[in-house]
């Protein structure tokens, strides 16, 4: 079942984030992750965390965060992370479509995401769900 994550899920979600970071070779800082997750688990002000629960265990998660843009015509969102333990099971597709529907019901007009340019498999997955490569280039700067 897919449901909203709660503070009671924090430990299991952090474990899933660790697995995601390990699989994708991203740095993992459990304190930073916990500090970022807590506000999302408390209310909808910054976004939502969705989890797949099977027999009392979490087997996947998705994080959607809110933004606002003139170009989008109002509220937009970023699919910040999505991860499922069982690849090729259909769970990733189910979770992605669920988050799209939920974001739409919360008034989001666009959903954005980013993935590594070389990851053709994942890019194909997102393309099958209607995501398109844009001509724009995102730049970032740490404000820490």
What are these regions (language model features)?
Residues 84, 89-101, 128:
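Conserved acetyl-CoA-binding loop-helix of GNAT-fold acetyltransferases
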């Amino acid at each position: 079942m897919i449901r909203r994550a709660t503070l009671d899920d924090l430990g299991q979600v952090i474990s899933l984030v660790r697995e995601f970071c390990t699989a994708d070779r991203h740095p993992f800082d459990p304190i930073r992750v916990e500090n970022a997750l807590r506000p999302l688990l408390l209310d909808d002000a910054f976004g939502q965390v969705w989890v797949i629960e099977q027999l009392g265990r979490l087997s996947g998660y998705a994080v959607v965060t809110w933004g606002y843009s003139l170009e989008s015509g109002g509220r937009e969102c970023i699919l910040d992370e999505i991860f499922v333990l069982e690849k090729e099971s259909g769970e990733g597709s189910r979770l992605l479509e669920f988050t799209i529907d939920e974001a739409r019901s919360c008034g989001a007009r666009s959903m954005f995401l980013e993935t590594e340019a070389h990851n053709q498999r994942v890019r194909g997955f997102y393309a099958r769900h209607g995501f398109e490569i844009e001509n724009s280039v995102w730049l970032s700067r740490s404000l820490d």
